[in-house]
Design a protein with these regions (language model features):
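A cross-family phosphate/adenosyl-ligand binding-site feature
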Residues: 8-196
């Protein structure tokens, strides 16, 4: 499970979690991109996440499950990713609801998603939160600040219009590529900006 790469140790495992916020397309596209790699992907989807995934994408549970190596029930606090001894390259919560953000910002590991996020932070691994809400209240902003101070990276899926995307898919791909880049994971979704 562990390999040496350019003088650093990497663990070929990552966690992807869907908290139930609108924007399930981001989580789905992230899983599709990770499926193209040799990484072991651990997936947690909350009950609200399943509802949004079905409603927003039309994807069935079976289709979603084929995109991950391991699916963990959001209630299973004894899962491997709930322990710091299970090493991962990091974790992406896509999309990240404001409820999940609040729980992560304040260390509330009340389900597997928030527990795994807490473990990721305490082990000093990268945690990327693709927060989805607009407009933002002062409470949301303070929770983003607290999560950032704890070590999380707030990465809202904001379209990069300077790239002149031709479709919604290209906008989604760019946001997912940014999240993968933040974990140092391979992605073939969007290239680097080269200027004009």
């Amino acid at each position: 499970r562990i390999r040496t790469f350019f003088n650093r140790i990497e663990v070929d495992s990552s966690a992807v979690l869907d908290s139930g916020s609108s924007g399930a397309t981001y989580g789905l596209r992230l899983l599709q991109a990770l499926k193209e790699t040799d990484l072991q992907v651990h997936l947690v989807i909350t009950p609200a996440g399943w509802l949004n995934l079905r409603h927003e994408t039309g994807v069935t549970d079976t289709q979603a499950l084929q995109l991950a190596h391991t699916l963990h029930a959001s209630t299973n606090l004894a899962a491997s990713i709930a322990s710091g001894s299970f090493q991962t390259m990091g974790m992406i919560v896509a999309p990240c609801s404001m409820r999940t953000l609040a729980a992560i910002a304040h260390g509330l590991g009340d389900n597997l998603l928030t527990r795994a996020a807490d473990v990721t932070l305490k082990e000093r691994r990268r945690l990327v939160l693709m927060t989805r809400e607009s407009p933002l209240s002062l409470v949301h902003l303070r929770n983003m600040t607290a999560a950032t101070e704890a070590g999380a990276i707030i990465c809202p899926p904001i379209p990069a219009l300077y790239q002149r995307p031709a479709s919604i898919d290209e906008m989604v791909d760019h946001s997912v590529a940014r999240a993968l880049d933040l974990l140092g994971l391979p992605q073939g979704l969007a290239g680097e900006w080269e200027g004009f």
